[in-house]
A protein has these predicted regions:
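Double-stranded beta-helix
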Residues: 107-151
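A short, N-terminal "cap"/entry segment at the start of jelly-roll beta-barrel domains
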Residues: 1-51, 133, 139-151
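Glycine- and acidic-residue-biased ligand/ion/polar-headgroup-sensing regions
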Residues: 65-83
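Short glycine/proline-enriched turns and hinge-like loops at secondary-structure junctions
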Residues: 63-66, 105-108
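Short acidic-glycine-tyrosine-enriched beta hairpin
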Residues: 78-102
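Conserved short histidine dyad/triad with adjacent acidic residue
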Residues: 45-65
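Tight coil/turn sites that cap or link beta-strands
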Residues: 55-57, 91, 97-99, 107-109
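Conserved hydrophobic/aromatic beta-strand scaffold that supports enzyme active sites
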Residues: 49-53, 70, 85, 93-95
C-alpha cells in the first residue's frame, strides 16, 4: 500500500526567542573544552551530504540552515527539534525545514548525515549553500568525495 502519511517528528525552525536562547547556549559551549568531530563530505548529483561522527557524551550545536534537509541519524542522541527535546536511538531519517537549528547530546557514538540540494563543486561552496554561519562549522578532517556528477 502506498499511503502517504505525515511524519510526527520534523526538525523545524525555532521561534525568535528560542533561537536567541540557542545562540546563548552556543556562546557557553564555545567556552568549554572542544571535542574534535570528524566531518565527511559528499558532493554528488546536485546534492551535498555532510556526515558528523560524534563520540558519546558530546553536546553539539548546529548552525541555522538555509535549506531544507534530510537528516539520517544512527546512534543514541537527545536532540532539540526546534520545539522540543527528543531522544532518538537506532536509525532515523528525518525531514528538516529551512531555518532550523539543532542542539544535540550524544549518549553513545552517533553518526548524522545531512543531505541538501546544492550545485556546489567544492566543500566551501556547499557549506555556503547550507548556512550563513560557515565560521561556526566543525572542520575536523574527514573524507571528501566530489564526483562531478550533475542532477
Amino acid at each position: 500500500v502506498n499511503d502517504i502519511t505525515e511524519r510526527a517528528l520534523s526538525l523545524v525552525a525555532p521561534d525568535r526567542t528560542t533561537l536567541d536562547a540557542l545562540r546563548d547556549i552556543d556562546a557557553g559551549l564555545r567556552e568549554l573544552p572542544q571535542v574534535e568531530v570528524t566531518i565527511d563530505h559528499l558532493i554528488h548529483g546536485g546534492m551535498y551530504g555532510r556526515t558528523a561522527h560524534l563520540p558519546a557524551g558530546v553536546v553539539a550545536s548546529g548552525t541555522v540552515l538555509r535549506r531544507a534537509t534530510v537528516l539520517v541519524l544512527h546512534g543514541d542522541v537527545t536532540m532539540f527539534t526546534g520545539t522540543e527535546a527528543v531522544r532518538l536511538t537506532g536509525f532515523h531519517v528525518l525531514p528538516g525545514l529551512r531555518g532550523r537549528k539543532a542542539l544535540f547530546r550524544t549518549h553513545a557514538e552517533t553518526h548524522m548525515t545531512m543531505i541538501l540540494p546544492s550545485d556546489a563543486q567544492s566543500v566551501e561552496e556547499a557549506e555556503a549553500d547550507m548556512t550563513d554561519e560557515t565560521g561556526l562549522l566543525a572542520r575536523a578532517p574527514g573524507n571528501v568525495t566530489i564526483t562531478k556528477e550533475t542532477s
